[in-house]
Amino acid sequence: MKLSLSPPPYADAPVVVLISGLGGSGSYWLPQLAVLEQEYQVVCYDQRGTGNNPDTLAEDYSITQMAAELHQALVAAGIEHYAVVGHALGALVGMQLALDHPASVTVLVCVNGWLRINAHTRRCFQVRERLLYSGGAQAWVEAQPLFLYPADWMAARAPRLEAEDALALAHFQGKNNLLRRLNALKRADFSHHADRIRCPVQIICASDDLLVPSACSSELHAALPDSQKMVMRYGGHACNVTDPETFNALLLNGLASLLHHREAAL
């Protein structure tokens, strides 16, 4: 699996791995790259079955497999220890990595994540699946911003959204891969295992997230032994895109604090 690695800003700089959500594209993190690369060696990637890592996914494809293939790629790149920043599905992959490779994951950041899929989130995906079956890739792509962004943010950026739709349609991961990745997301359940995650965790959520209720992050916070929760009042599901200034400040401060906390505990 292909990874994109930024140059380390200094010798032995900590590594931060960015894991996007269901869309799978590493470019989702573009608003974070410049600030993170000043302090960390940053790893981005298109998830298997998407972008520059094309593949046909098995019907039983799982979050566990997503975590395993990423860890294998990191080890192959010579990376043994890393912090993980995961958005939605990416947060699930991050938790699986923390469970399966506790000696490797130094810090975990969960952005608009959950322990197991919420009934409201499931309802949203049911609607989106119906759109996919009835209207194909174009209907899925055109509906996606409604679940990602606040209405006023979208209304002020109509040309940008049209360009994003065209790009997403041109690079659509395919119906079968998308549904198999979505099914992996829906099957994931960390409610009985989260207390085994021992690395420090930062939880970031947006109170106006239409897709994932912020209560899901409260449940994560209650279940994860060494966690702190930060709430953005505005930003929607893709709060790192819509309000990068606020998000980046929370992320940078959180990473620095948790990495220092971990080093002090060793």
UniProtKB/Swiss-Prot annotation:
Record GO biological process: nitrogen utilization; uracil catabolic process
Keyword terms, alphabetized: Hydrolase
InterPro entries, sorted: AB_hydrolase_1, AB_hydrolase_fold, AB_hydrolase_sf, Pyrimidine_utilisation_RutD
Enzyme Commission number(s): 3.5.1.-
Keyword Metal-binding on entry: no
UniProt cross-references to Pfam families, sorted A to Z: Abhydrolase_1
Expression triggers: Up-regulated by the nitrogen regulatory protein C (NtrC also called GlnG) and repressed by RutR.
GO molecular function, a single term: hydrolase activity, acting on carbon-nitrogen (but not peptide) bonds, in linear amides
Reactions the enzyme catalyzes: carbamate + 2 H(+) = NH4(+) + CO2
SUPFAM superfamilies: alpha/beta-Hydrolases
Domain of life: Bacteria
Family assignment from sequence similarity: Belongs to the AB hydrolase superfamily. Hydrolase RutD family.
UniProt cross-references to HAMAP family, sorted A to Z: RutD (MF_00832)
Role played: Involved in pyrimidine catabolism. May facilitate the hydrolysis of carbamate, a reaction that can also occur spontaneously.
Protein name listed in UniProt: Putative carbamate hydrolase RutD
Organism encoding this protein: Escherichia coli O157:H7
Lineage: Bacteria, Pseudomonadati, Pseudomonadota, Gammaproteobacteria, Enterobacterales
Gene that encodes it: rutD
